[in-house]
Amino acid sequence: MLTNPSQVIIRNQETLSQHRVLVLNHEADSLPKALLDVAQSVDALALDYHHYLHLAPQANAKLRCYFGHQLPHQDKYDTVIVYFPKAKPLAPYLFNLAAQHLVADGQLLVVGENKGGVKSLVKLLPKYFATGVKLDNARHCLLFGSSIIDTAPEIKLSDWTSQYQLATPQGNITICNLVGVFSEKHLDQGTELLLSHLPTLSGRVLDFGCGAGVIAAALLKAQPTLSLECIDINAMALASCELTLAANGMTAKVYPSDGLAQTSGKFDGIISNPPFHDGLASTTSIAQSFVADSAKQLQSKGIWQIVANRHLPYSDTIAAEFGQLTVPAENNKYKLYSFQQA
């Protein structure tokens, strides 16, 4: 099943006949493979690890699948398709990336849902692209076309990074935040509650849903000998976390994981302000899987501690998996859940 934006691309696929195509920020469907009906070859770069895992099994000699914030090569393409991102500040970065990979007379296609901000494309396109032209309007989506008219600057992550000092209970740390990664530039209430009651940890520790690396840097500030692993599904978050750790002179293993599926072995500590705050059925299911998998991957005497919105129904799930559970701290919005393995 193709998403609505992908269906709009298929409606206009005749423009891709025998083209070398690059798809940036694709969704969790098979659009890149479907384009092989007309295209010479397709490369697809996912910025969401779930989307990459969905497509990767379909890779073949003409379809290459990648995950990350950039491609591992400098290949050029006749057409670059950009899915307009949910995080609007990420859009100019994707356009800059597209420009690096377009041949001189290549075409840029940008597709997105009307409610997702794609209507503002004309204002967001950098000056090295021609004014965006509306090519289609269907499935509650818009498709725009453009082309390169000037040399685009090379991508330097520093140009797309906001760097700032953050005061934490463990001391001041430097945060590096790439475009498209959530940041309030101060400690949110949930993270502050978690960091204010950090347990003493040792050995191998996991930061689940690491984001830009706030919790990771605070952990290593207080306990620099930890063997820390940081996981997330968002490529820009993972790159931000790596930059944050480097800016603070810290090291950790940073990698993508779908839940805990790409981790291995057991941990002496699992710490998280998990991204499960909206209460939707989909994220509630992910949260329940995280809790269940955590219980299996905690060493004897291992410590598990997360902070969560107090109105979300996680208490029963956590209690069912861990049994003996403590709530060492809470406020009017968040609860801190803690467990130590027997």
UniProtKB/Swiss-Prot annotation:
Subcellular location field: Cytoplasm
GO CC annotations on file: cytoplasm
InterPro entries: DNA_methylase_N6_adenine_CS, Mtase_sm_N, rRNA_ssu_MeTfrase_C, RsmC/RlmG, SAM-dependent_MTases_sf, Small_mtfrase_dom
Keyword Cell membrane on entry: no
EC number(s) reported in the record: 2.1.1.172
CDD domains (UniProt xref): AdoMet_MTases
HAMAP family: 16SrRNA_methyltr_C
Family according to the record: Belongs to the methyltransferase superfamily. RsmC family.
The name this protein goes by in its record: Ribosomal RNA small subunit methyltransferase C
Organism: Shewanella sp. (strain MR-7)
